[in-house]
Curated annotation (Swiss-Prot):
Residue stretches making up the SMP-LTD domain: 1-204
GO biological process, one term: phospholipid transport
Compositionally biased residues, Basic residues: 372-385
Sorted UniProt keywords: Lipid transport, Lipid-binding, Membrane, Mitochondrion, Mitochondrion outer membrane, Transmembrane, Transmembrane beta strand, Transport
A single cellular component GO annotation: ERMES complex
Function according to Swiss-Prot or TrEMBL: Component of the ERMES/MDM complex, which serves as a molecular tether to connect the endoplasmic reticulum (ER) and mitochondria. Components of this complex are involved in the control of mitochondrial shape and protein biogenesis, and function in nonvesicular lipid trafficking between the ER and mitochondria. MDM34 is required for the interaction of the ER-resident membrane protein MMM1 and the outer mitochondrial membrane-resident beta-barrel protein MDM10.
Species this chain originates from: Candida albicans (strain SC5314 / ATCC MYA-2876)
The record's note on its domains: Lacks alpha-helical transmembrane segments, suggesting that it resides in the membrane via beta-sheet conformations similar to those predicted for other outer membrane proteins and porin. The SMP-LTD domain is a barrel-like domain that can bind various types of glycerophospholipids in its interior and mediate their transfer between two adjacent bilayers.
Subcellular location: Mitochondrion outer membrane
Residue ranges that the Swiss-Prot or TrEMBL entry lists as coiled coil: none
Family the entry assigns: Belongs to the MDM34 family.
Primary location class: mitochondrion
Quaternary state and interactors: Component of the ER-mitochondria encounter structure (ERMES) or MDM complex, composed of MMM1, MDM10, MDM12 and MDM34.
Descriptive protein name: Mitochondrial distribution and morphology protein 34
Amino acid sequence: MSFKVNWNSLETEPLTNWTKELLTSALNSGKSPNILALNITIKDLNFGKIAPDFEILEIGELDRDRFRGIFKIDYQGDFHLTLHTKVQANPLNIYYHNSLEKEVCNYSQDEFITPNFLLSNEQFAIPLDLKLSDIKINGIGIIVFSKSKGLTLVFRNDPLDSIKVSSTFDTVQVLANFLQKQIENQIRDLFRETLPTLIHQLSLKYLSLDNNINEIKSKLSQQDSVSMTNNELASSLKLFDDEENEFPLIYSSKNLQKNMQLFKSRETFRLSAPKFKNIVQRTRLDKFTKSYPNLLNSLYANNADLQHRFVNNINHGHNNNSNTSSTGIPIELLVSHDDKQHYGKTDNLLKDISSIQANNFYKYSNKDAPNKPKRRRIKVHKKSKVKQDDNTVKASELQNVDSTFMESRSISPQETIDTTSTLIESAPMTRNVSTNIKSPTLETMSTGSSSSASSQVIAHPTPKRAHQPADSTVSTTTINKENHIDYIKARNLYQDFIQMSQSPGYYDKVISNGRGIGLGNSGGNYFGFNGNGNGLERTMSASPIKHLNKDKKSINYIDTSKINEKLNQFRLDGGKNSANTNNSSGGKNFRPGFTRNESNGQQGILFEAFNFPSVAPPPPPYC
């Protein structure tokens, strides 16, 4: 859709004068820069002979009182505008005023001491004529019009294509280029911000007010004899005639008339004030609250037998001159002593109350919703359950014991074990260790009943023997003692046979010499890091025969066949050697119960105090 505008109709003197006044007020609004020595005036304004092309691209909304659409404007005409002003040519004066604004800010010049230079304060104004012509505009804008909110114009793009700026300083090329750039930027800001705001204010001032001012004046004058005096009417009409009013009137005449009638109807001393439709007045608020549906009123309405109580309650409230009536349910309805025939049964009343509350709940909520009204439930003649003690242990909890504890042999409580161990040293020492081992037990506590759970013993696991005795009827105490004794015997035998073995070890070179093992001992370094050669050096085989190297045993290898031979020898010859040694020693450095064998230049110590079996137990396993 396009329009053809009669552009020649704009060349009228009233429109030209109105446009000049509008542009002058817009250009001089706000604070003027310090470079201007005089206000800006419109010297010449000419719309030209070429009309712009105005095209409506889209109409979004169209009604009697509102319009919204998208348009396109294209102008390449002969419009020109000439502005006249005076600029300040004294740079010292401009710098002086700019520095005052920057340093003093909001302080008055009387409170701030400034130097008074004569030359810098002198005015040197030069007249300036600025002509704008050859304007080319091409843009797309949105127009929104409402009868109550006015006209709004917004451009989607930058509509200014080009403009020609000519002034009295065209001979100075630097000033001409500066003015060209500055004016182009200002005109772009004009189309983007200033022009939409200006058009909106003008539409509110001249469209809405001009269309309704005559109608408002006529209707207000007709009500002069009824609701207003002549002075009040004159003052109100003067208010509408005042063009300098800061608050533009944007209400319609019908709304103003209704509001005026409502306001004037309350300016009276009459007791019977006129009612308003669909309005609750403060003077009639008590009647509204009494007639408002609540739980008590609904309960009275559903039960015909309770209506006389409802009437008595209202009369009692009027007699007491109470402004607020209680909407709660009287306790007499639920517990009554004078009229037991009607009010003795509370079940029916409670069901009615529940149904009323449920209907009120589902009235303002979705019936299909899963949420149900929450009710307070009171159970009568219900005893509270006895709380169980937190320390109570249930029998079922005892079944969660680890199976490894159940399979291991238990140690009887308060069992005393005396052990005597001997270190392999030149001066043997005796150590007596007496330990009391008590088996932990779980004491069952009462759970409120007379029967008590059977006690179960949980014992710490002990190392198992290599072979179990055939007789299973041996008592637990005897088995535990034998296991413990056999373990000590096997441990000592293992240490003894390692010492007597042919494999090279640190017993011969370190322990026999009284030297310790470790990096910090002065007697020697086991790893052979010292330079004197006293430490043990780990020898490596240099034989070229590969298969012999493969069959060569490590230094930590233990020959079990030799160990068995030694065991048999000790078993067969132990008594004889012990007797001979006992006679030769004289009882000084020999302890009874030990056997010494000094064959092959090695000393061996064997426990004979314990009657161990004929077959020696194997070494204890490493964990």
